[in-house]
């Protein structure tokens, strides 16, 4: 017998039905006829037949069945020199592996401290940190695998070794307690950990879990300062264009295109008069310094996370504006927190984006304690310090240090803060619980309106001080519109007012010039009213109003019916010409 044949010898134990000696002889005879069987040993009482040889047990069973003897394997095959006795045990151990999914994660940690804003110098504080997220779900599945002894490891055939090594490399199995010969050390080979190429990082056996060595973030302050300084000068010119664009919230687009003629609510977008309204940025910043609340010189948000500062009209943060913690104070617009604690801006929160984005320091539900800026929705506490005449609360950007010839345009909502008075940057505070937009003629709702006094024209008196009565004193002798304490019709409802007509013409001319001329300054350069200046072309596509020929005041606030001018019906020949060809027929 060659060595190879000897190595292949297997011992197989079969259970065969043996009733008598005759059966025993018959079985022995059948088995010995089979090729590859060397010895047979039969225990008749137990029906146990032990066969050794180089033969497959299934062949033995087949031959016995053919002879009418039912046979089955007694236990698992026991190897001679192969030592396979432990295989069933090992299979059971693999079955016993439990896959344990991680338990539920713990609850999230509380929010961070209210004020992390290192780089914040002037503006209201940022909102408090949000609450921590809920704890993550349990970790990756853990496998509990029975401990294998080194003897058992040696008995594993290569396929099983490979399976174990694959298990070890799977995510979540790094903590398997395996003997060192299966846990690959550094170096090549299956299951080994790749060599560490970065000497600073410790060798990480968990190749899928990444740990970042990030240096402490000490330069956050420098970051915000660096950007703030870099963009400071740009802010001054952007302030005019961007800050008050249609009062910061996004109203219906048509308002930018033409003024509403009905009800006397003439909306003049603030960005249409940049250089006249904002003569220079320093005065604008000075105006901001009057903002209510502790913010030293509010209006500029310099929060840590902002790549560039946004200058707001709102005064400094109200209470909590300095600390930032209880809620983002200041004009909380670019601050992404948009008003400290959710919709109700807590102590200092500027509330929702629509509720006082530019308000100085918030306060009360959705309100702005400083009443500064253009808050669209001053809550119960709105305008505590009132925007009255540029005093008290932050007033608009124009509430302090105006050039000579301009009158301060404060809010008309009363010094003590009438019903939620709000200072518009255009002057004319918007009172009332929630008017639609800061509007400039007395119109729906208790609106107090101070139109800007244009050089060379009389100033308009207040048109119904919203709760605070008339808040800007027109100089004596000036025609004052119907002053009503609760927002009656403003001057626009009195068409016989010559000053009003002249001023409306001026406004329309300036508005049109702004539309055509975009952002160029127009205070002293264009469209000064001349003695016989014809009415400016209406912006809503109606022909001009021939006021001098009207004997009686037109009783309705909307435009006159179309009456074409006498010069050949061509109203476009001198559309932008100051010379009025239709006023005098004798040339």
Swiss-Prot record:
The keyword Metal-binding applies. Residues 534-547, 554-565 have a biased composition (Pro residues). A metal cation binds at residues 20, 23. Keywords: Lipoprotein, Metal-binding, Methylation, Prenylation. Residues 104-113, 121-140, 290-300, 312-419, 428-445 have a biased composition (Gly residues). Signal peptide: none annotated. One of its GO terms (cellular component) is plasmodesma. Residues 215-248 have a biased composition (Acidic residues). SUPFAM superfamilies: HMA, heavy metal-associated domain. Gene3D superfamilies: 3.30.70.100. A lipid is attached at residue 584 (S-farnesyl cysteine). The modification Cysteine methyl ester is found at residue 584. Residues 585-587 form a propeptide. One of its GO terms (molecular function) is metal ion binding. Residues 194-208, 471-483 have a biased composition (Low complexity). The keyword Lipoprotein applies. Residues 98-146, 176-261, 287-449, 462-504, 532-587 are annotated as: Disordered. Pfam families: HMA (PF00403). Residues 578-587 have a biased composition (Polar residues). Residues 9-72 form the HMA domain. Belongs to the HIPP family. Heavy-metal-binding protein. This is Heavy metal-associated isoprenylated plant protein 33. It comes from Arabidopsis thaliana. The gene is HIPP33.
